[in-house]
């Protein structure tokens, strides 16, 4: 039976409120970074309350509660105590019957509980038994959730007799759309406002944000405190209910722990009986289980060569400094429409049994095949935007005039059209089968787009929760196809991604997903890079191109010039794919995202609006180059202008304060509360020299 919300007896959202110990000391003027990290970890937090929101998925009944505790470690609850008190409360309010609790006194009829939290690794350490608890859930993207077996607890609910409870932990942060990862944003999507707490006076008679001193809020504003604490638990439950509604709409059997897992499940569903043939999988010699299947020989024998041709996006900045636009030529930020989902539509059923090895350039230029190659190349010296990627390891991809590249056939096509001299050192391609021309991922992308269309609001500025979930699942599909492909690379550099296994306390190599395929990953990313490169090289020479970031670019090209630049063979292919996946059959392949009249460009992924204007005058270009401001600004424009000020006044000694949480590995080994560690880092908004300046 699949794990759906209605397969649980209870859904329990939970939250803890706490205050950092160093902020509740007598001397509050001592900066946090003056305290050694080891002491901060040891001091941890003071938990002041536990709050729960309870939901019965069978009846729709709900209730909630908040329980204050003394802020001492000795007074912390165990998770078993939380379950005991919560199930008793649910029983009192009719959400679970006494008879059901008594049945669970037998191990074969456990009470099934879905435990929902938002960023669970902030809350789980608030339990007294975290030392044991940390091994009973799985680490997923720097937080905790249940991926494998549920945890079993035995709270004493009726007459001190233990009842067996099977608990699956869901972290709503892992189930949130991009840009909506905070509780207040999830609440806004649901129409449930995340509450705030008032400012409070600390021991130094200073007014500080209440969220930093929840112990004082609890004492001086008890009603606001309780409402705030309960609301956080309610939002977690409500979002999990929305995720289950999404699962039901998409006809999926399981409520996965992440949005990516839901996307992968849908891809497998639409693949149906073509799944193994499409992905190039077959049963191994010792097992017939799906999880034990292996790649066919056509992939296995060439897996490192294929993986060497798998890269990320094209990310470069071409200028450095502040740039004013010319009259009637504002800076426009363009994106490829649905880049990766459209790229996925290229894939048909490969003939895995007949890999073709060749050094014939013409054979690799066939853009109706899946081709990868290692080549030596040289572009004409006046080429503005060379198009063959070279992995510069720590610098990422660079695009030199001459060098050796692992690339795809799509990129070779663009380079040839630019007049590059190309020598193929090794090449490999797979043709598509002629007896089965199905494009399986088109079915997936259409399911995404149909779901988005059906869930769309009338508003042009707001999206519904379901629309965002469909979009996120569509975007996650490519990520699952590419998961752990890089570990097969043999080129210089560290390509293996290690993850921490909380069940064992050891580091482990990230494994592929059920739909990982190295050739598909290489081909999809190669197609996107090739299309973007073709557009760049087709722009007129007078166009000022500021930067390119994966599937978009910033330049002062007019709409007409951009349209003319999208008429090459790769853009034509991309346009054909676009018609297959767009709900209205549109073949538009570019979309305008932002505009500005004056911009700062400093480095890759570092660009800022100085003066708004152009066709989208309310938008702000804000690529922060990995930095964030210590103090929040009221708008994106204010944030952008503050970065411009910092850039203009910076010196070689300029520092920026950054607060990073201790790693999940550190937290696990110390059984520590979640704390952040302030660090002063040297600011680097300088040109990154992925290209050589010419003037």
Where are the model-predicted features located?
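An active-site-proximal beta-strand-loop segment
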Residues: 16-44, 474
């Amino acid at each position: 039976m699949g794990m759906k919300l209605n397969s649980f007896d209870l859904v329990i959202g939970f939250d803890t409120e706490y205050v950092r110990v160093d902020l509740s000391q007598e001397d509050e003027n001592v900066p946090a970074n003056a305290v050694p990290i080891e002491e901060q970890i040891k001091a941890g937090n003071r938990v002041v309350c536990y709050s729960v929101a309870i939901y019965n998925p069978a009846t729709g009944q709900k209730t909630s509660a908040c329980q204050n505790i003394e802020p001492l470690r000795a007074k912390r609850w165990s998770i078993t105590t939380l379950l005991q008190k919560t199930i008793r409360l649910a029983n009192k309010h009719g959400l679970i019957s006494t008879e059901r609790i008594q049945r669970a006194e037998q191990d074969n009829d456990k009470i099934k509980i879905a435990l929902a939290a938002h960023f669970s690794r902030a809350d789980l350490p608030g339990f007294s038994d975290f030392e044991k608890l940390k091994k009973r859930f799985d680490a997923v993207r720097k937080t905790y959730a249940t991926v494998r077996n549920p945890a079993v607890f035995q709270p004493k609910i009726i007459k001190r007799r233990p009842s067996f409870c099977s608990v699956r932990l869901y972290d709503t942060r892992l189930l949130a759309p991009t840009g909506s990862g905070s509780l207040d944003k999830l609440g806004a999507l649901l129409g449930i406002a995340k509450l705030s707490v008032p400012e409070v006076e600390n021991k130094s008679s200073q007014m500080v944000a209440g969220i930093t001193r929840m112990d004082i809020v609890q004492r001086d504003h008890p009603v606001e405190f309780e409402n705030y604490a309960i609301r956080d638990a309610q939002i977690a439950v409500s979002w999990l209910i929305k995720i289950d509604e999404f699962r039901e709409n998409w006809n999926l059997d399981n409520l996965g722990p992440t949005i990516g897992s839901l996307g992968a499940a849908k891809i497998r569903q639409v693949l149906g009986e073509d799944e193994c043939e499409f992905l190039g999988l077959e049963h191994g010699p010792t097992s017939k289980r799906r999880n034990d299947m292996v790649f066919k020989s056509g992939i296995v024998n060439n897996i490192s060569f294929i993986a060497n041709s798998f890269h990320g996006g094209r990310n470069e900045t071409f200028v450095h400094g502040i740039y004013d636009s010319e009259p009637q030529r504002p800076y426009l930020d363009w994106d490829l429409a649905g880049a990766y989902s459209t790229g996925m539509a290229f894939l048909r059923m490969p003939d895995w049994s007949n890999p073709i090895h060749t050094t014939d350039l013409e054979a690799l230029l066939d853009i109706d095949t899946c081709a990868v190659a290692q080549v030596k190349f040289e572009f004409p010296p006046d080429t503005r935007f060379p198009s063959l990627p070279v992995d510069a390891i720590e610098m990422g991809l660079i695009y030199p005039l001459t060098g050796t590249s692992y690339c795809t056939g799509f990129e070779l096509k663009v380079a040839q059209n630019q007049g590059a001299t190309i020598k193929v050192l090794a090449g490999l391609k797979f043709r598509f089968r002629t007896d089965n021309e199905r494009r399986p991922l088109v079915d997936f992308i259409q399911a995404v787009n149909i779901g988005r269309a059906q869930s769309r609001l009338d508003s042009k500025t707001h999206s519904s929760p379901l629309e965002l979930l469909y979009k996120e699942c569509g975007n996650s599909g490519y990520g699952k196809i590419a998961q752990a492909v890089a570990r097969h690379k043999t080129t210089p550099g560290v390509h293996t991604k290690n993850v921490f296994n909380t069940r064992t306390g050891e580091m482990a190599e990230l494994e592929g997903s059920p739909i990982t395929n190295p050739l598909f990953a290489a081909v999809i990313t190669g197609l996107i890079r090739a299309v973007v490169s073709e557009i760049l090289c087709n722009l007129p020479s007078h166009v000022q191109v500021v930067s390119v970031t994966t599937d978009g670019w910033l330049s002062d090209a007019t709409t007409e010039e951009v349209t003319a630049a999208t008429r090459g063979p790769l853009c034509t292919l991309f346009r054909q794919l676009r018609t297959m996946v767009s709900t209205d059959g549109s073949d538009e392949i570019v979309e305008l995202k932002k505009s500005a009249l004056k911009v700062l460009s400093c480095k890759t992924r570092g660009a800022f609006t100085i003066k708004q204007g152009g066709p989208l005058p309310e938008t702000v270009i804000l690529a922060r180059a990995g930095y964030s401001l210590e103090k929040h600004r009221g708008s994106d424009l204010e944030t952008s202008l503050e970065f411009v000020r910092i850039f203009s006044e910076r010196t070689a000694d300029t520092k920026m304060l950054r607060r990073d949480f201790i790693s999940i590995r550190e937290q696990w080994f110390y059984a520590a509360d979640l704390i952040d560690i302030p660090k002063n880092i040297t600011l680097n908004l300088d040109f990154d020299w992925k290209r050589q300046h010419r003037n």
